[in-house]
């Protein structure tokens, strides 16, 4: 798929920027924890995590049309992360990353934050449905399982 490629060490800072920005924009409003989202969570630490854990980087693919605008991280048949830089959202980049992961990496399910209605709607538009399964991450973050439909 055009513009999608495996992530490399050179992408680590952009991957970290995209993830941190999305956490702040999408999750801070729900959890309202400024000390975490604007203190503990930072690009330097996130980039270091990806540099030190090669499995994280190996499982990432980026959308790069000259600028890295989005990332998807896949483990087995699970989509673990999918984020697009907010300035480039609503341009089909997330859908292209997800389509790539479904077609090339055989992604069939994911866990979505229960409060993230925008994200859940995006996944539904792209062929996923809620399964009814719910889990708590870190004992306080409610996640809902979504599975790819047979279409």
Task: Explain the meaning of each model-derived region.
Residues 111-113, 129-145:
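Conserved catalytic-core motifs of GNAT/GCN5-like acyltransferases
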Residues 78-89, 112-113:
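A short, internal acetyl-CoA/4′-phosphopantetheine-binding micro-motif in the GNAT/acyltransferase core
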Residues 62, 66-83:
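Conserved beta-strand in the GNAT
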Residues 3-17:
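A short beta-loop-alpha structural element at the N-terminal edge
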Residues 84, 90-103, 121, 125:
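Conserved acetyl-CoA-binding loop-helix of GNAT-fold acetyltransferases
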């Amino acid at each position: 798929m055009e513009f999608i490629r495996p992530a490399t060490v050179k992408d680590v800072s952009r991957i970290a920027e995209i993830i941190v920005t999305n956490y702040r924009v999408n999750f801070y409003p729900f959890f309202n924890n400024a000390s975490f989202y604007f203190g503990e969570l930072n690009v330097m630490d996130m980039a270091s995590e990806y540099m030190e854990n090669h499995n994280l980087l190996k499982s990432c693919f980026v959308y790069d049309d000259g600028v890295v605008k989005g990332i998807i991280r896949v483990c087995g048949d699970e989509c673990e992360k999918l984020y697009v830089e907010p300035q480039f959202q609503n341009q089909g980049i997330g859908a292209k990353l997800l389509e790539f992961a479904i077609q090339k990496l055989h992604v069939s399910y994911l866990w979505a934050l229960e409060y993230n209605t925008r994200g859940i709607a995006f996944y539904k538009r792209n062929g996923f449905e809620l399964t009814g399964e719910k889990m708590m991450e870190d004992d306080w973050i409610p996640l809902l399982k979504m599975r790819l439909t047979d279409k």
